[in-house]
């Protein structure tokens, strides 16, 4: 959203409660190696959100008219060009951090500003219209337009919004699970009992039909 606004000539201000991606990497390494948790800069909070430390798989919504534009933004920021046409686009495990940084630099080059370690701790409204935001409990920034992209883990922000009487509506969510099966189980279910007598390729689990008798 900030990049789109910047491209139109506006100068968006972005307040990120966590650190920039490089500082965030150091904080994450400290946690993984020694258990030192920075509550505002970790695998959830910080530049790029949780996706910064994902495996790089893109969940595309083919019927979304904006998807092509989003893919193009990724490519311009350093993602592989093949994600334009792959059925299951993947930008690589280490690429998200590079892409996030490049998008930020593009926003700044277009006139936007990015502030890190800057949590919105309060919102001032009058007559159901936002007038200002408070950063880190101290700095007041006037605005009449505000986008909140806080993910699902900023519970303190949701509590603040609720206390301010701002209407919110929950959205549907999905919970993923990891299922592991022996390779023999998969091959037998897909190719039959003589699976070891034929040449076979790896099966994409999305297209794997579980044969219930084999579960017993």
Question: Where does each model-flagged region fall?
Answer:
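Residues forming the flavin
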Residues: 2-216
């Amino acid at each position: 959203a900030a990049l789109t606004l910047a491209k139109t000539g506006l100068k968006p201000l972005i307040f990120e409660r966590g650190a920039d991606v490089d500082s965030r990497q150091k904080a994450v390494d400290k946690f993984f190696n020694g258990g030192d948790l920075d509550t505002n800069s970790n695998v959830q909070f910080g530049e790029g959100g949780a996706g910064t430390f994902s495996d790089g798989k893109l969940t595309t919504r083919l019927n979304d008219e904006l998807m092509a534009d989003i893919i193009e933004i990724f490519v311009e920021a350093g993602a592989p060009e093949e994600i334009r046409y792959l059925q299951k686009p993947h930008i690589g495990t280490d690429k998200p951090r590079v892409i996030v940084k490049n998008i930020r630099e593009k926003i700044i080059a277009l006139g936007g500003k990015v502030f890190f370690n800057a949590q919105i701790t309060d919102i001032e409204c009058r007559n159901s219209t936002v007038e200002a935001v408070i950063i880190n409990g101290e700095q007041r920034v006037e605005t009449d337009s505000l986008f909140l992209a806080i993910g699902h883990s900023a519970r303190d922000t949701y509590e603040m919004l609720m206390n301010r009487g701002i209407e919110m509506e929950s959205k549907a969510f999905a919970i993923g699970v990891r299922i592991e099966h022996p390779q023999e189980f998969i091959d037998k279910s897909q190719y039959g009992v003589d699976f070891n007598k034929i040449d076979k390729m790896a099966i994409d689990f999305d297209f794997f039909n579980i044969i219930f008798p084999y579960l017993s």
